[in-house]
Amino acid sequence: MSVKKINLLDLDRKGLRALFSEMGEKPFRADQLMKWVYHFGVTDFEEMNNINKVLRTKLAAKCEIVAPEIASFQKSNDGTIKFAINVGQGQEVETVYIPEEDRATLCVSSQVGCALECTFCSTGQQGFNRNLTVSEIIGQVWRVSQFLGFHKDTGDRPISNVVMMGMGEPLLNLANVIPAMDIMLDDFGFSLSKRRVTLSTSGVVPALDKLGDAIDVALAVSIHAPNDELRDVLVPVNKKYPLQEFLAGIRRYLEKSNANRGRVTVEYVMLDHINDSTDQAHELAILMKDTPCKINLIPFNPYPGSPYGRSSNSRIDRFSKVLMEHGLTVIVRKTRGDDIDAACGQLAGDIRDRTKRLAKKQMQQNQISVTME
């Protein structure tokens, strides 16, 4: 029976240094290896010519460097690319590359599915299977970098920003998300600025406190409603961590963070005649008055079976103007990749749902149909 090899993509620099120490090697070997993997895209130990032959042989016997494969991809008319990433056992997660004039952002998944059941999000309706490993999270960045033209000779990289806004709730997978983000920030990893790595959360407050103690990255928060009554429906985790508790956690995070420059990004999906009235805009402004923030209004992106519609441009404009009258900074997000279901809230992947959510929903729909007949 062969011994399972250690995937070195599962280890941040601290973990790699511990591994090399166990092998009787100097800690700086971890720095050398990371530079080969993340700066030059090399996964074959034999190509690492500043590591001696004996150590290369030891590494090959005990370790491997394996990123998940791209199963397929689609390119939008606006240049956005959606990747289906094979994470094994017949399952796929989705990763989205969004090129712009001044940046190139990769939207990364943290879980196979999602347990939070936000009612406006396609991923939330697919159910949940498992957390992604460190290698499956950082491997999305590595694999897409290779696909886009990672230059081994110069070390030039095509990704300037990473957002943990793909499938899953990152704060429910902190044990793997934090080391993955460490690699993104590490000078020997992807060497991204802490202001260019963003984690988005729906509000798992105890984990948000742990995040603030462990790492400093930009924070985006999914609010989506100006009061608990509506947010309980749209974002069910609100029943456990209501808005005032969430906002207090956000303020605690901001006190620890330099990456956010003192304010958080508030994400607010615009649902037609659900959360987009001028009264609700006033209510949102009052809610956020003690929390330094900028508001990102997100036009809803419909998906098959969605119960909601997108707010009209005129309703979004009115909502935005009310917020600005209260002195808030407001950005209306430009929709990208919606023609290939790669926009915010549309990611689904291929999930074997351990929660049986889709099956339960179908059963409920069948029962309703029988009753109506």
Curated annotation (Swiss-Prot):
Domain Radical SAM core, chain residue ranges per copy: 100-339
Sites where the protein binds [4Fe-4S] cluster: C114, C118, C121
Disulfide bond entries: C107-C344
S-adenosyl-L-methionine recorded as keyword: yes
Cofactor note text: Binds 1 [4Fe-4S] cluster. The cluster is coordinated with 3 cysteines and an exchangeable S-adenosyl-L-methionine.
Pfam families: Radical_SAM (PF04055), RlmN_N (PF21016)
Coiled coil (UniProt feature): none
EC number: 2.1.1.192
Family stated for the protein in its record: Belongs to the radical SAM superfamily. RlmN family.
Miscellaneous comment in the UniProt entry for this protein: Reaction proceeds by a ping-pong mechanism involving intermediate methylation of a conserved cysteine residue.
Biological role: Specifically methylates position 2 of adenine 2503 in 23S rRNA and position 2 of adenine 37 in tRNAs. m2A2503 modification seems to play a crucial role in the proofreading step occurring at the peptidyl transferase center and thus would serve to optimize ribosomal fidelity.
The name this protein goes by in its record: Dual-specificity RNA methyltransferase RlmN
Native source species: Shewanella frigidimarina (strain NCIMB 400)
